Curated annotation (Swiss-Prot):
The keyword Iron does not apply. Heterodimer of a large (catalytic) subunit and a small (regulatory) subunit. This is Poly(A) polymerase catalytic subunit. Induction: Expressed in the early phase of the viral replicative cycle. Ca(2+) 1 binds at residues 202, 204. Keywords: ATP-binding, Calcium, Early protein, Metal-binding, mRNA processing, Nucleotide-binding, Transcription, Transferase. Disulfide bonds: none annotated. It is an enzyme of class 2 (transferase). It catalyses: RNA(n) + ATP = RNA(n)-3'-adenine ribonucleotide + diphosphate. InterPro entries: PolyA_pol_cat_Poxvir (IPR004976), PolyA_pol_cat_sf (IPR037265), PolyA_pol_nucTrfase_Poxvir (IPR024231), PolyA_pol_nucTrfase_sf_Poxvir (IPR038419), Poxvirus_polyA_pol_cat_C (IPR024397), Poxvirus_polyA_pol_cat_N (IPR024398), Poxvirus_polyA_pol_cat_N_sf (IPR038337). One of its GO terms (biological process) is mRNA processing.
Length: 479
Protein backbone atom coordinates (compact mmCIF):
# COMPACT_ATOMS: atom_id res chain seq x y z
CA UNK A 1 0.00 0.00 0.00
CA UNK A 2 1.34 3.47 -0.93
CA UNK A 3 1.97 5.83 1.94
CA UNK A 4 2.63 9.52 1.95
CA UNK A 5 6.12 10.61 3.02
CA UNK A 6 6.29 11.31 6.74
CA UNK A 7 4.57 14.66 7.27
CA UNK A 8 5.86 14.93 10.87
CA UNK A 9 9.47 15.53 9.95
CA UNK A 10 10.95 18.97 9.39
CA UNK A 11 9.65 20.65 6.22
CA UNK A 12 11.10 18.84 3.26
CA UNK A 13 11.99 21.24 0.44
CA UNK A 14 12.17 18.47 -2.13
CA UNK A 15 8.79 17.15 -1.04
CA UNK A 16 7.26 20.62 -1.39
CA UNK A 17 8.72 21.02 -4.89
CA UNK A 18 7.27 17.69 -6.02
CA UNK A 19 3.95 18.36 -4.30
CA UNK A 20 3.61 21.76 -5.97
CA UNK A 21 4.43 20.25 -9.35
CA UNK A 22 2.01 17.31 -9.08
CA UNK A 23 -0.74 19.34 -7.42
CA UNK A 24 -1.02 16.60 -4.83
CA UNK A 25 0.97 14.96 -2.08
CA UNK A 26 3.17 12.37 -3.83
CA UNK A 27 3.08 8.73 -2.91
CA UNK A 28 6.19 7.21 -1.36
CA UNK A 29 7.06 5.67 -4.72
CA UNK A 30 6.52 8.94 -6.59
CA UNK A 31 8.62 10.84 -4.07
CA UNK A 32 11.60 8.50 -4.20
CA UNK A 33 11.47 8.19 -7.98
CA UNK A 34 11.14 11.93 -8.60
CA UNK A 35 13.34 13.42 -5.90
CA UNK A 36 16.43 13.38 -8.14
CA UNK A 37 14.41 15.42 -10.65
CA UNK A 38 13.68 18.14 -8.09
CA UNK A 39 15.94 20.72 -9.75
CA UNK A 40 14.34 20.22 -13.16
CA UNK A 41 10.88 20.19 -11.61
CA UNK A 42 11.54 23.48 -9.83
CA UNK A 43 12.62 25.11 -13.10
CA UNK A 44 9.37 23.95 -14.69
CA UNK A 45 7.29 25.19 -11.76
CA UNK A 46 8.76 28.72 -11.75
CA UNK A 47 8.82 28.97 -15.55
CA UNK A 48 6.93 32.04 -16.76
CA UNK A 49 4.13 30.48 -18.81
CA UNK A 50 2.75 33.89 -19.85
CA UNK A 51 5.97 34.85 -21.63
CA UNK A 52 6.09 31.42 -23.24
CA UNK A 53 2.50 31.79 -24.48
CA UNK A 54 3.42 35.19 -25.93
CA UNK A 55 6.41 33.72 -27.81
CA UNK A 56 4.34 30.91 -29.30
CA UNK A 57 1.68 33.41 -30.41
CA UNK A 58 4.37 35.52 -32.10
CA UNK A 59 5.78 32.43 -33.83
CA UNK A 60 2.27 31.60 -34.98
CA UNK A 61 1.69 35.11 -36.33
CA UNK A 62 4.96 35.13 -38.24
CA UNK A 63 5.28 31.58 -39.58
CA UNK A 64 1.85 29.92 -39.24
CA UNK A 65 -0.41 32.89 -39.96
CA UNK A 66 -2.64 30.83 -42.28
CA UNK A 67 -3.39 28.16 -39.66
CA UNK A 68 -6.91 28.61 -38.33
CA UNK A 69 -6.53 28.72 -34.56
CA UNK A 70 -7.19 31.38 -31.94
CA UNK A 71 -4.90 32.89 -29.32
CA UNK A 72 -7.07 31.45 -26.56
CA UNK A 73 -6.81 27.94 -28.04
CA UNK A 74 -3.01 28.22 -28.10
CA UNK A 75 -2.94 29.38 -24.48
CA UNK A 76 -5.26 26.58 -23.37
CA UNK A 77 -3.11 23.94 -25.09
CA UNK A 78 0.07 25.26 -23.47
CA UNK A 79 -1.41 25.49 -19.97
CA UNK A 80 -2.98 22.07 -20.39
CA UNK A 81 0.38 20.51 -21.24
CA UNK A 82 2.17 22.21 -18.36
CA UNK A 83 -0.42 20.81 -15.95
CA UNK A 84 -0.59 17.36 -17.52
CA UNK A 85 1.44 15.84 -14.69
CA UNK A 86 -1.37 16.57 -12.22
CA UNK A 87 -3.52 13.95 -13.94
CA UNK A 88 -0.70 11.45 -14.52
CA UNK A 89 0.13 8.66 -12.07
CA UNK A 90 2.36 6.41 -14.16
CA UNK A 91 6.00 7.00 -13.17
CA UNK A 92 7.33 6.37 -16.68
CA UNK A 93 4.94 8.90 -18.17
CA UNK A 94 5.84 11.42 -15.45
CA UNK A 95 9.52 11.08 -16.34
CA UNK A 96 8.67 11.70 -20.01
CA UNK A 97 6.59 14.77 -19.19
CA UNK A 98 9.36 16.18 -16.99
CA UNK A 99 12.00 15.57 -19.67
CA UNK A 100 9.99 17.23 -22.45
CA UNK A 101 8.81 20.13 -20.30
CA UNK A 102 12.45 20.67 -19.26
CA UNK A 103 13.49 20.97 -22.91
CA UNK A 104 10.83 23.63 -23.49
CA UNK A 105 11.69 25.53 -20.31
CA UNK A 106 15.45 25.61 -20.89
CA UNK A 107 15.79 25.87 -24.67
CA UNK A 108 12.69 27.15 -26.46
CA UNK A 109 13.41 30.86 -26.01
CA UNK A 110 16.94 30.63 -27.41
CA UNK A 111 16.08 28.21 -30.22
CA UNK A 112 12.68 29.31 -31.55
CA UNK A 113 11.60 32.24 -29.39
CA UNK A 114 14.50 34.31 -30.72
CA UNK A 115 13.03 34.09 -34.22
CA UNK A 116 10.32 36.55 -33.18
CA UNK A 117 12.69 39.47 -32.53
CA UNK A 118 14.15 41.76 -35.17
CA UNK A 119 16.71 39.97 -37.31
CA UNK A 120 20.16 41.27 -38.22
CA UNK A 121 20.44 42.81 -41.67
CA UNK A 122 20.88 40.23 -44.42
CA UNK A 123 24.28 40.43 -46.07
CA UNK A 124 23.60 39.88 -49.75
CA UNK A 125 26.33 37.58 -51.01
CA UNK A 126 24.99 36.01 -54.18
CA UNK A 127 27.12 35.55 -57.28
CA UNK A 128 25.51 35.47 -60.71
CA UNK A 129 26.08 32.03 -62.22
CA UNK A 130 25.43 31.19 -65.87
CA UNK A 131 23.67 27.89 -65.21
CA UNK A 132 22.11 27.76 -68.69
CA UNK A 133 25.53 27.14 -70.25
CA UNK A 134 25.84 23.90 -68.25
CA UNK A 135 22.37 22.48 -68.89
CA UNK A 136 23.26 20.61 -72.07
CA UNK A 137 26.39 19.14 -70.49
CA UNK A 138 24.43 18.06 -67.42
CA UNK A 139 21.74 16.51 -69.62
CA UNK A 140 24.38 14.53 -71.53
CA UNK A 141 25.98 13.26 -68.31
CA UNK A 142 22.67 12.25 -66.78
CA UNK A 143 21.43 10.62 -69.96
CA UNK A 144 24.38 8.22 -69.96
CA UNK A 145 23.47 7.25 -66.38
CA UNK A 146 19.75 6.86 -67.06
CA UNK A 147 20.01 3.08 -67.24
CA UNK A 148 17.69 1.83 -64.50
CA UNK A 149 14.92 -0.53 -65.53
CA UNK A 150 11.83 0.40 -63.56
CA UNK A 151 9.98 -2.46 -61.91
CA UNK A 152 6.38 -1.24 -61.99
CA UNK A 153 5.41 -3.75 -59.32
CA UNK A 154 7.94 -2.31 -56.88
CA UNK A 155 6.45 -0.22 -54.09
CA UNK A 156 8.51 2.91 -53.57
CA UNK A 157 8.94 4.10 -50.00
CA UNK A 158 8.36 7.80 -50.56
CA UNK A 159 6.77 9.75 -47.73
CA UNK A 160 3.55 11.73 -47.76
CA UNK A 161 4.16 15.42 -47.19
CA UNK A 162 2.29 17.53 -44.64
CA UNK A 163 0.58 20.75 -45.66
CA UNK A 164 2.61 22.40 -42.87
CA UNK A 165 5.89 22.00 -44.79
CA UNK A 166 5.55 25.46 -46.36
CA UNK A 167 5.11 27.02 -42.89
CA UNK A 168 8.06 25.11 -41.46
CA UNK A 169 10.18 26.10 -44.48
CA UNK A 170 9.46 29.77 -43.76
CA UNK A 171 10.52 29.23 -40.16
CA UNK A 172 13.61 27.28 -41.22
CA UNK A 173 14.81 30.07 -43.51
CA UNK A 174 14.91 32.39 -40.52
CA UNK A 175 16.30 29.68 -38.24
CA UNK A 176 19.21 29.04 -40.62
CA UNK A 177 20.12 32.73 -40.49
CA UNK A 178 19.90 33.04 -36.70
CA UNK A 179 21.65 29.76 -35.91
CA UNK A 180 24.16 29.56 -38.76
CA UNK A 181 26.95 28.30 -36.48
CA UNK A 182 24.99 25.21 -35.45
CA UNK A 183 22.74 24.57 -38.46
CA UNK A 184 23.53 24.45 -42.18
CA UNK A 185 21.53 23.28 -45.17
CA UNK A 186 22.16 21.19 -48.25
CA UNK A 187 20.05 19.78 -51.06
CA UNK A 188 17.55 21.52 -53.30
CA UNK A 189 16.91 24.55 -51.07
CA UNK A 190 20.62 25.30 -50.78
CA UNK A 191 20.93 25.15 -54.57
CA UNK A 192 17.83 27.32 -54.91
CA UNK A 193 19.80 30.05 -53.11
CA UNK A 194 22.24 29.89 -56.03
CA UNK A 195 19.70 29.27 -58.79
CA UNK A 196 16.10 30.45 -58.14
CA UNK A 197 14.84 28.18 -60.94
CA UNK A 198 15.30 25.14 -58.70
CA UNK A 199 12.16 23.78 -57.05
CA UNK A 200 12.45 22.49 -53.51
CA UNK A 201 10.24 20.65 -51.02
CA UNK A 202 11.34 20.56 -47.41
CA UNK A 203 14.68 22.04 -46.35
CA UNK A 204 17.48 19.52 -45.69
CA UNK A 205 19.59 20.37 -42.65
CA UNK A 206 22.61 19.28 -40.65
CA UNK A 207 22.79 20.57 -37.09
CA UNK A 208 24.52 20.04 -33.78
CA UNK A 209 21.39 20.10 -31.59
CA UNK A 210 18.92 18.20 -33.71
CA UNK A 211 16.97 16.46 -30.94
CA UNK A 212 16.39 19.62 -28.91
CA UNK A 213 15.41 21.65 -31.96
CA UNK A 214 12.95 19.03 -33.22
CA UNK A 215 11.32 18.68 -29.79
CA UNK A 216 10.85 22.45 -29.56
CA UNK A 217 9.47 22.58 -33.10
CA UNK A 218 7.16 19.62 -32.49
CA UNK A 219 5.64 21.39 -29.50
CA UNK A 220 5.28 24.64 -31.41
CA UNK A 221 3.31 22.79 -34.10
CA UNK A 222 1.27 20.94 -31.47
CA UNK A 223 0.36 24.12 -29.60
CA UNK A 224 -0.62 25.91 -32.82
CA UNK A 225 -2.49 23.12 -34.61
CA UNK A 226 -3.61 20.89 -31.75
CA UNK A 227 -2.35 17.86 -33.67
CA UNK A 228 -0.35 15.05 -32.12
CA UNK A 229 3.22 15.26 -33.39
CA UNK A 230 5.58 12.28 -33.37
CA UNK A 231 9.38 12.30 -33.60
CA UNK A 232 10.93 9.17 -35.09
CA UNK A 233 14.50 7.86 -35.14
CA UNK A 234 15.44 5.51 -37.98
CA UNK A 235 18.12 2.91 -37.11
CA UNK A 236 19.66 2.60 -40.59
CA UNK A 237 20.10 6.38 -40.97
CA UNK A 238 22.78 7.60 -38.64
CA UNK A 239 21.73 10.29 -36.14
CA UNK A 240 18.60 10.99 -38.17
CA UNK A 241 15.28 12.16 -36.77
CA UNK A 242 12.05 13.11 -38.49
CA UNK A 243 8.89 14.92 -37.39
CA UNK A 244 5.58 13.55 -38.65
CA UNK A 245 2.00 14.48 -37.90
CA UNK A 246 -0.60 12.09 -36.51
CA UNK A 247 -1.43 10.92 -40.05
CA UNK A 248 2.20 9.94 -40.70
CA UNK A 249 2.77 12.92 -43.01
CA UNK A 250 6.37 14.14 -43.21
CA UNK A 251 7.03 17.65 -41.84
CA UNK A 252 10.81 17.98 -41.47
CA UNK A 253 13.86 15.83 -40.79
CA UNK A 254 17.37 16.48 -39.59
CA UNK A 255 20.77 14.82 -39.26
CA UNK A 256 22.69 15.53 -36.08
CA UNK A 257 26.48 15.90 -36.20
CA UNK A 258 29.15 16.83 -33.67
CA UNK A 259 30.43 20.40 -33.55
CA UNK A 260 33.90 19.29 -34.67
CA UNK A 261 32.32 17.68 -37.73
CA UNK A 262 30.29 20.82 -38.40
CA UNK A 263 33.47 22.90 -38.27
CA UNK A 264 35.16 20.99 -41.10
CA UNK A 265 32.20 20.57 -43.45
CA UNK A 266 33.03 22.70 -46.54
CA UNK A 267 30.46 25.46 -46.72
CA UNK A 268 29.71 28.80 -48.34
CA UNK A 269 27.82 31.83 -47.00
CA UNK A 270 24.77 33.11 -48.88
CA UNK A 271 22.36 35.71 -47.45
CA UNK A 272 23.40 34.97 -43.83
CA UNK A 273 22.91 31.21 -44.38
CA UNK A 274 25.66 28.61 -44.56
CA UNK A 275 25.11 25.92 -47.18
CA UNK A 276 27.22 22.84 -47.82
CA UNK A 277 29.72 23.70 -50.55
CA UNK A 278 28.10 22.74 -53.89
CA UNK A 279 31.37 21.03 -54.86
CA UNK A 280 30.87 18.67 -51.92
CA UNK A 281 27.22 18.25 -52.84
CA UNK A 282 28.16 17.41 -56.43
CA UNK A 283 30.47 14.65 -55.21
CA UNK A 284 27.67 13.33 -53.02
CA UNK A 285 25.33 13.30 -56.02
CA UNK A 286 27.87 11.32 -58.07
CA UNK A 287 28.24 8.92 -55.16
CA UNK A 288 24.47 8.72 -54.76
CA UNK A 289 23.96 7.49 -58.33
CA UNK A 290 25.62 4.22 -57.36
CA UNK A 291 22.42 3.55 -55.42
CA UNK A 292 19.97 1.70 -57.65
CA UNK A 293 16.98 3.51 -56.11
CA UNK A 294 18.43 6.88 -57.10
CA UNK A 295 18.87 5.77 -60.68
CA UNK A 296 15.21 4.82 -60.66
CA UNK A 297 14.41 8.35 -59.43
CA UNK A 298 16.52 9.75 -62.27
CA UNK A 299 14.58 7.68 -64.78
CA UNK A 300 11.27 9.05 -63.49
CA UNK A 301 12.20 12.75 -63.44
CA UNK A 302 15.46 13.52 -65.29
CA UNK A 303 14.74 17.26 -65.56
CA UNK A 304 14.65 17.66 -61.77
CA UNK A 305 18.16 16.23 -61.58
CA UNK A 306 19.30 18.18 -64.64
CA UNK A 307 18.74 21.65 -63.19
CA UNK A 308 20.51 20.64 -59.96
CA UNK A 309 23.44 19.06 -61.78
CA UNK A 310 23.80 22.06 -64.10
CA UNK A 311 23.82 24.42 -61.11
CA UNK A 312 26.59 22.48 -59.38
CA UNK A 313 28.63 22.10 -62.58
CA UNK A 314 28.48 25.85 -63.16
CA UNK A 315 29.53 26.43 -59.54
CA UNK A 316 32.64 24.23 -59.85
CA UNK A 317 33.47 25.76 -63.24
CA UNK A 318 33.26 29.28 -61.80
CA UNK A 319 34.88 28.50 -58.42
CA UNK A 320 37.61 26.01 -59.35
CA UNK A 321 38.19 26.86 -63.00
CA UNK A 322 37.26 23.35 -64.14
CA UNK A 323 37.56 23.03 -67.90
CA UNK A 324 35.12 20.60 -69.48
CA UNK A 325 37.10 19.31 -72.44
CA UNK A 326 36.83 15.55 -71.91
CA UNK A 327 40.34 15.15 -70.43
CA UNK A 328 39.85 12.31 -67.97
CA UNK A 329 43.38 10.91 -67.46
CA UNK A 330 43.00 8.01 -65.00
CA UNK A 331 39.37 8.52 -64.09
CA UNK A 332 37.46 6.69 -62.96
CA UNK A 333 40.12 4.91 -60.94
CA UNK A 334 40.38 1.14 -61.41
CA UNK A 335 37.97 -0.78 -59.17
CA UNK A 336 38.06 -4.53 -58.53
CA UNK A 337 35.27 -6.15 -56.54
CA UNK A 338 35.52 -9.21 -54.30
CA UNK A 339 31.85 -10.16 -54.22
CA UNK A 340 32.30 -12.93 -51.66
CA UNK A 341 33.98 -10.70 -49.08
CA UNK A 342 32.07 -7.59 -50.26
CA UNK A 343 35.16 -5.41 -50.61
CA UNK A 344 36.08 -3.20 -53.57
CA UNK A 345 39.75 -2.34 -54.14
CA UNK A 346 40.28 1.07 -55.74
CA UNK A 347 43.71 1.85 -57.21
CA UNK A 348 44.52 5.37 -55.99
CA UNK A 349 48.29 5.69 -56.53
CA UNK A 350 47.91 7.94 -59.60
CA UNK A 351 46.25 10.66 -57.53
CA UNK A 352 47.00 10.27 -53.83
CA UNK A 353 49.80 9.37 -51.43
CA UNK A 354 48.00 6.15 -50.39
CA UNK A 355 48.34 3.47 -53.07
CA UNK A 356 44.91 1.88 -52.81
CA UNK A 357 41.60 2.10 -51.01
CA UNK A 358 39.76 -0.90 -49.59
CA UNK A 359 36.06 -0.07 -49.70
CA UNK A 360 33.95 -2.27 -47.42
CA UNK A 361 30.29 -2.84 -48.15
CA UNK A 362 29.64 -4.11 -44.60
CA UNK A 363 30.31 -1.57 -41.87
CA UNK A 364 30.70 -4.10 -39.05
CA UNK A 365 33.40 -5.95 -40.98
CA UNK A 366 35.30 -2.69 -41.50
CA UNK A 367 35.04 -1.87 -37.79
CA UNK A 368 36.39 -5.30 -36.89
CA UNK A 369 39.30 -5.03 -39.33
CA UNK A 370 40.21 -1.54 -38.08
CA UNK A 371 40.38 -2.94 -34.54
CA UNK A 372 42.69 -5.69 -35.76
CA UNK A 373 44.99 -3.05 -37.29
CA UNK A 374 45.31 -1.47 -33.84
CA UNK A 375 45.12 1.95 -35.47
CA UNK A 376 43.55 4.89 -33.66
CA UNK A 377 43.76 7.52 -36.40
CA UNK A 378 40.44 6.86 -38.10
CA UNK A 379 38.20 9.79 -39.05
CA UNK A 380 34.47 9.53 -38.46
CA UNK A 381 32.48 12.13 -40.38
CA UNK A 382 29.12 10.76 -39.26
CA UNK A 383 26.18 11.28 -41.64
CA UNK A 384 28.21 13.73 -43.74
CA UNK A 385 29.83 10.75 -45.49
CA UNK A 386 28.13 7.82 -43.72
CA UNK A 387 31.55 6.35 -43.14
CA UNK A 388 34.74 6.10 -41.16
CA UNK A 389 38.02 6.56 -43.05
CA UNK A 390 41.42 5.25 -41.99
CA UNK A 391 44.78 5.47 -43.76
CA UNK A 392 47.25 2.86 -42.52
CA UNK A 393 50.46 1.70 -44.24
CA UNK A 394 49.57 3.60 -47.42
CA UNK A 395 46.14 1.96 -47.64
CA UNK A 396 42.83 3.73 -47.09
CA UNK A 397 40.05 1.78 -45.40
CA UNK A 398 36.47 3.01 -45.65
CA UNK A 399 32.82 1.97 -45.84
CA UNK A 400 30.43 2.56 -48.74
CA UNK A 401 26.76 2.61 -47.80
CA UNK A 402 25.28 2.41 -51.30
CA UNK A 403 24.82 -0.48 -53.69
CA UNK A 404 27.58 -1.36 -56.15
CA UNK A 405 26.36 -1.63 -59.73
CA UNK A 406 27.92 -4.24 -61.99
CA UNK A 407 28.11 -3.96 -65.78
CA UNK A 408 29.05 -7.63 -66.15
CA UNK A 409 29.85 -10.53 -63.88
CA UNK A 410 32.52 -9.35 -61.44
CA UNK A 411 32.92 -5.98 -63.20
CA UNK A 412 32.16 -2.70 -61.41
CA UNK A 413 29.92 -0.43 -63.48
CA UNK A 414 31.50 2.93 -64.30
CA UNK A 415 28.65 4.72 -62.48
CA UNK A 416 29.68 2.96 -59.25
CA UNK A 417 33.38 3.40 -60.02
CA UNK A 418 32.81 7.15 -60.19
CA UNK A 419 30.73 6.96 -57.01
CA UNK A 420 33.62 5.27 -55.19
CA UNK A 421 36.04 7.91 -56.49
CA UNK A 422 33.68 10.64 -55.28
CA UNK A 423 33.53 8.97 -51.86
CA UNK A 424 37.32 9.17 -51.59
CA UNK A 425 37.27 12.80 -52.74
CA UNK A 426 34.84 13.67 -49.95
CA UNK A 427 37.57 12.63 -47.52
CA UNK A 428 40.10 14.79 -49.33
CA UNK A 429 37.83 17.83 -49.08
CA UNK A 430 37.07 17.25 -45.40
CA UNK A 431 40.75 16.90 -44.52
CA UNK A 432 41.92 19.81 -46.71
CA UNK A 433 43.76 17.42 -49.01
CA UNK A 434 44.38 17.84 -52.73
CA UNK A 435 41.30 17.13 -54.80
CA UNK A 436 40.93 19.62 -57.67
CA UNK A 437 42.84 17.72 -60.37
CA UNK A 438 41.07 14.53 -59.40
CA UNK A 439 37.74 16.38 -59.41
CA UNK A 440 38.41 17.75 -62.88
CA UNK A 441 39.26 14.31 -64.25
CA UNK A 442 36.25 12.75 -62.52
CA UNK A 443 33.80 15.26 -64.01
CA UNK A 444 35.36 15.00 -67.45
CA UNK A 445 35.07 11.21 -67.27
CA UNK A 446 31.30 11.69 -67.24
CA UNK A 447 31.28 13.40 -70.64
CA UNK A 448 30.39 11.75 -73.95
CA UNK A 449 29.61 8.37 -72.43
CA UNK A 450 27.36 5.72 -73.91
CA UNK A 451 24.73 4.04 -71.80
CA UNK A 452 25.98 0.81 -70.25
CA UNK A 453 23.23 -1.54 -69.00
CA UNK A 454 23.25 -2.74 -65.41
CA UNK A 455 24.02 -6.45 -65.17
CA UNK A 456 23.31 -6.71 -61.44
CA UNK A 457 24.03 -4.94 -58.17
CA UNK A 458 25.15 -5.78 -54.66
CA UNK A 459 22.71 -5.41 -51.80
CA UNK A 460 23.10 -2.61 -49.28
CA UNK A 461 24.48 -3.32 -45.85
CA UNK A 462 21.65 -4.30 -43.50
CA UNK A 463 21.64 -2.13 -40.39
CA UNK A 464 20.57 -3.62 -37.05
CA UNK A 465 18.59 -1.71 -34.47
CA UNK A 466 15.07 -0.65 -33.74
CA UNK A 467 13.06 2.43 -34.51
CA UNK A 468 12.88 5.02 -31.76
CA UNK A 469 10.18 7.59 -31.24
CA UNK A 470 8.82 10.34 -29.04
CA UNK A 471 5.03 10.43 -28.82
CA UNK A 472 4.08 13.70 -27.11
CA UNK A 473 0.39 12.86 -26.73
CA UNK A 474 1.02 9.46 -25.14
CA UNK A 475 4.04 10.57 -23.06
CA UNK A 476 6.33 7.90 -24.48
CA UNK A 477 10.04 8.12 -25.29
CA UNK A 478 11.64 5.02 -26.83
CA UNK A 479 15.27 5.41 -27.94
Amino acid sequence: MNRNPDQNTLPNITLKIIETYLGRVPSVNEYHMLKLQARNIQKITVFNKDIFVSLVKKNKKRFFFDVDTSASEIKDRILSYFSKQTQTYNIGKLFTIIELQSVLVTTYTDILGVLTIKAPNVISSKISYNVTSMEELARDMLNSMNVAVIDKAKVMGRHNVSSLVKNVNKLMEEYLRRHNKSCICYGSYSLYLINPNIRYGDIDILQTNSRTFLIDLAFLIKFITGNNIILSKIPYLRNYMVIKDENDNHIIDSFNIRQDTMNIVPKIFIDNIYIVDPTFQLLNMIKMFSQIDRLEDLSKDPEKFNVRMATMLEYVRYTHGIVFDGTRNNMPMKCIIDENNRIVTVTTKDYFSFKKCLVYLDENVLSSDILDLNADTSCDFESVTNSVYLIHDNIMYTYFSNTILLSDKGKVHEISARGLCAHILLYQMLTSGEYKQCLSDLLNSMMNRDKIPIYSHTERDKKPGRHGFINIEKDIIVF
